[in-house]
Amino acid sequence: MNFTKSEALHKEALEHIVGGVNSPSRSFKAVGGGAPVAMERGKGAYFWDVDGNKYIDYLAAYGPIITGHAHPHITKAITTAAENGVLYGTPTALEVKFAKMLKEAMPALDKVRFVNSGTEAVMTTIRVARAYTGRTKIMKFAGCYHGHSDLVLVAAGSGPSTLGTPDSAGVPQSIAQEVITVPFNNVETLKEALDKWGHEVAAILVEPIVGNFGIVEPKPGFLEKVNELVHEAGALVIYDEVITAFRFMYGGAQDLLGVTPDLTALGKVIGGGLPIGAYGGKKEIMEQVAPLGPAYQAGTMAGNPASMASGIACLEVLQQEGLYEKLDELGAMLEKGILEQAAKHNIDITLNRLKGALTVYFTTNTIEDYDAAQDTDGEMFGKFFKLMLQEGVNLAPSKYEAWFLTTEHTKEDIEYTIEAVGRAFAALADNK
């Protein structure tokens, strides 16, 4: 493929935009460098870049484009909203309708508040949990990404009995000292940390199904034990369902897994592609939020008509019968094909899949936590990524990210992708 225009555009972008990208995850730094491909148009399961190259898209904007690009029902809703004015700064009927839809989908949401991003949703659930409990410390699992607010950009300390350290310049050590990080899927270290710090902990942040060091499911009984131990300590359980809500099941991971949190943070998928976030939970906890309670949160763009209309339309599409079964069927087909190609070409991989999302790790180890995900071959993934790009298959430029299927992918797309994987694996095998 020819990437001349993408390369020229990136060179120009470097003159005007920090690093040439508006989110570091779009950079090709983690896959060997080079100019990231600039896309010009998306439709269904496909992208076309500025050079005219066509791709089957498995990035799906890091998950939220579950209905495919430019879905006609969602596009029509956005267009209608735009014609009526995109921002009022007042209550609307749309926000009430959308809140009711979210509550019907996720029974753990007694009350809901809309915001503008997943980062904002998580940030506010932390504030609400602190207000409700009167405590300050937060727990999280290593490797799980909860946005870019200071409190969640914290890496693990040297063990479960030590506090965190800043994971970004500009995050004060004093903030990191309010965060305890423990490994995912490990009850013993969670218990040890709660034994030491539990009386100071306001809440634990949980990705019920991990999506930020690949797709990693909780071990059987793990989430139930998290609820039990955290509640025994008098703290709250916050589910970050920014990736998982409406991705694996209409009612989110909490419905799929049958475990109920106290608070839930939402984003991405629920907006149908427009900027959005939301948080909600038990009535007595949510009533800590202004104007009813002392926990302040506000936003001019929150609940704007365009995002509300897009979100309503997205959920209407996702209510279609058989939609999630189709995603699971295509995911299983893709998984089987990739594993067969890996065996054929003697390429060592571990593949984690849940329904319509999967991650290919270049390792033979089982991936159940962040340490295992880190100990995979990033250089091999970078080569694989570039080979797949040449084949017209668009993936996320990171070994930690997932492949996301949409409702618009077809069996023919999957068949082509498997063939492309085979050619990429053959090239990798030839250069071992």
Curated annotation (Swiss-Prot):
Any single GO BP term: protoporphyrinogen IX biosynthetic process
One Gene Ontology MF term: pyridoxal phosphate binding
Disulfide-linked positions: none
EC nos: 5.4.3.8
Main localization of the protein described in the UniProt heading: cytoplasm
Enzyme class: isomerase
CDD domains reported in the protein's UniProt record: OAT_like
Catalysed reaction equations from the record: (S)-4-amino-5-oxopentanoate = 5-aminolevulinate
One Pfam family in the UniProt entry: Aminotran_3
Gene3D superfamilies in UniProt: Aspartate Aminotransferase, domain 1, Type I PLP-dependent aspartate aminotransferase-like (Major domain)
Chain positions with N6-(pyridoxal phosphate)lysine modification: K268
Cofactor(s) in the UniProt record: pyridoxal 5'-phosphate
Compartmental location: Cytoplasm
Keyword field: Cytoplasm, Isomerase, Porphyrin biosynthesis, Pyridoxal phosphate
Family, as annotated: Belongs to the class-III pyridoxal-phosphate-dependent aminotransferase family. HemL subfamily.
Description of how the protein assembles with itself and partners: Homodimer.
Protein name: Glutamate-1-semialdehyde 2,1-aminomutase 1
Organism: Bacillus cereus (strain ATCC 14579 / DSM 31 / CCUG 7414 / JCM 2152 / NBRC 15305 / NCIMB 9373 / NCTC 2599 / NRRL B-3711)
Classification of source organism: Bacteria, Bacillati, Bacillota, Bacilli, Bacillales
